[in-house]
C-alpha cells in the first residue's frame, strides 16, 4: 500500500514483509548490571533497562555512556554478534507494554559493542537508510502488532519467534527511507532544544521567586 502522508516525488507502493524475512537475529549476552563496569572495560554493552528508559529510537554510541564489559571470555564467545551501525536492539522484557521498544545503533566506529540481557539484537538482511528502522519499529503502527503477542502478568515479555511473523512496512527507495529518518531526527533535536529552554526558564523562575 501507500502511506497517506508522504514526501513529494515518491509514488511507489511500500513493501510489506514479515520481520523474519527482513531482519536476522544475532546473539545477546546475559550479563546483569552487577557484571558490568561504569568505569572501564574492553567493550560496551547495551542493557535492556537503558533501551526502555534512557535511549531514544537512535542510539549514538559516541554520545551515550554505555556500561562496559570487562571479561575477555565474553568477547570471544559473542564475536559473531559484535554490533554494527544499523543494527536494532529490542528490549524483550519490561514491567508493562513498553516491551518491544528498541534503539537503532549509530555512530559506531571501531568500538566493540554487544547487546545485553533481555534484548534481541537484529541485523537488516538488506541495507536500510540510517534511522528508518529505529523510528518505524517504535511507531504505533508496528508496536500495536506486538501487544497481543506479549506474555506475563507482573513482568511482560515477547519472544523472538512471536516477532518473526509481524509485518514491517517500508519504502523500497533508500532515499525516501533516509528522508523519513532525518525528519524524525530533526523533530527529536527540536524537542531536546525546547526541553533545555524549558528547564532554563524554570531555573530562572525559581531563582527570581
Regions picked out by a protein language model, each given a short descriptive name:
Residues 1-15, 196-209:
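Short amphipathic coiled-coil heptad-repeat segments
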Residues 181, 192-194, 199:
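A detector of tandem-repeat and repeat-rich interaction/domain scaffolds
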Residues 6-30, 42, 174:
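Non-catalytic DNA-recognition/assembly elements of restriction-modification systems
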Residues 23-170:
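DNA target-recognition domains and sequence-specific DNA-contacting regions of bacterial/archaeal
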Amino acid at each position: 500500500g501507500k502511506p497517506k502522508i508522504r514526501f513529494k516525488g515518491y509514488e511507489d507502493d511500500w513493501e510489506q514483509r514479515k520481520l523474519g524475512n527482513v531482519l536476522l537475529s544475532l546473539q545477546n549476552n546475559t550479563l546483569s548490571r552487577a557484571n558490568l563496569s561504569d568505569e572501564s572495560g574492553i567493550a560496551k554493552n547495551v542493557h535492556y533497562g537503558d533501551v526502555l528508559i534512557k535511549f531514544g529510537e537512535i542510539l549514538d554510541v559516541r554520545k551515550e555512556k554505555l556500561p562496559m564489559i570487562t571479561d575477555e571470555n565474553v568477547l570471544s564467545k559473542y564475536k559473531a554478534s559484535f554490533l554494527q551501525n544499523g543494527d536494532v536492539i529490542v528490549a524483550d522484557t519490561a514491567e508493562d507494554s513498553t516491551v518491544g521498544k528498541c534503539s537503532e545503533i549509530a555512530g559506531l566506529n571501531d568500538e566493540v559493542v554487544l547487546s545485553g540481557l533481555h534484548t534481541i539484537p537484529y541485523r537488516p538482511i538488506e541495507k536500510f537508510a540510517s534511522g528508518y528502522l529505529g523510528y518505524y519499529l517504535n511507531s504505533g503502527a508496528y508496536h500495536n502488532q506486538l501487544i497481543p503477542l506479549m506474555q506475563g502478568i507482573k513482568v511482560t515479555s515477547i519472544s523472538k519467534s512471536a516477532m518473526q511473523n509481524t509485518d514491517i512496512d517500508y519504502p523500497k527507495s533508500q532515499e525516501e527511507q533516509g528522508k523519513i529518518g532525518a525528519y524524525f531526527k530533526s523533530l527529536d533535536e527540536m524537542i531536546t532544544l525546547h526541553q533545555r529552554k524549558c528547564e532554563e526558564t524554570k531555573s530562572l523562575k525559581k531563582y527570581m521567586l
